[in-house]
A protein has these predicted regions:
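Short, charged beta->alpha transition segments
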Residues: 1-4
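Catalytic alpha/beta core domains of metabolic enzymes, predominantly
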Residues: 6-11, 19-132
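Conserved short secondary-structure transition element at the edge of the structured enzyme core
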Residues: 79, 122-157
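Long, low-complexity C-terminal extensions of enzymes
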Residues: 160-169
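Generic, ordered loop/turn and secondary-structure boundary motif
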Residues: 25, 156-159
Length: 169
């Protein structure tokens, strides 16, 4: 499927590879094969552990720019692994931007501050990343609470629990 899409254009192509969430995805070898056959495959949004992203980056030898998602889990380690950036969930975007800036700055003091900020937001990331449904239900509520917005669910959707709503606050 990806190859057919890539063959239909000369534009650079990005894909999202989320095997842990979708139950199907491309292995590191599969990504390498796809990129060799389709040089316009230039960007990957991975959805995996930082160690997996490091292996993808090493194996691709600079032929593929790699971002990771996963709501920002392992944010600092993903940047250390060579990800060019992250596409995290927006609940803590202001703090995630600061972490990225500090990691880009480099040095012991900047990285220590990045780790400190990451430790502050980690409970939020872990809370929302329990499942896709949980992420959609509670992630939007955390962001809305931070922005002072109302939440409007589209059905079908997970119904928040009283306990979950307490955690959002």
């Amino acid at each position: 499927f990806f190859g057919r899409v890539m063959d239909s254009t000369s534009l650079p192509v990005a894909i999202q590879n989320a095997p842990d969430y979708l139950g199907v995805g491309l292995s590191v070898k599969g990504l390498m094969d796809l990129q060799q056959r389709h040089p316009n495959f230039t960007l990957l949004k991975g959805e995996g552990p930082a160690g997996t992203m490091a292996e993808v980056i090493r194996s691709m030898q600079g032929k593929l720019s790699v971002f990771n998602g996963r709501g920002g889990l392992e944010l600092t380690d993903n940047l250390r692994a060579g990800c060019v950036g992250m596409v995290p969930a927006p609940e803590c975007v202001d703090r995630q931007i600061r972490i990225f800036e500090l990691m880009e700055e480099g040095g012991t003091e900047a990285e220590s501050e990045a780790e400190r900020i990451y430790q502050e937001i980690l409970p939020v990331i872990v809370f929302v990343m329990q499942s896709i449904e949980h992420f959609l239900c509670y992630g939007k509520r955390i962001l809305a609470a931070r922005l002072g917005l109302d939440v409007h669910d589209r059905l079908p959707s997970m119904t928040p629990t009283a306990f979950g709503l307490e955690r959002v606050q």
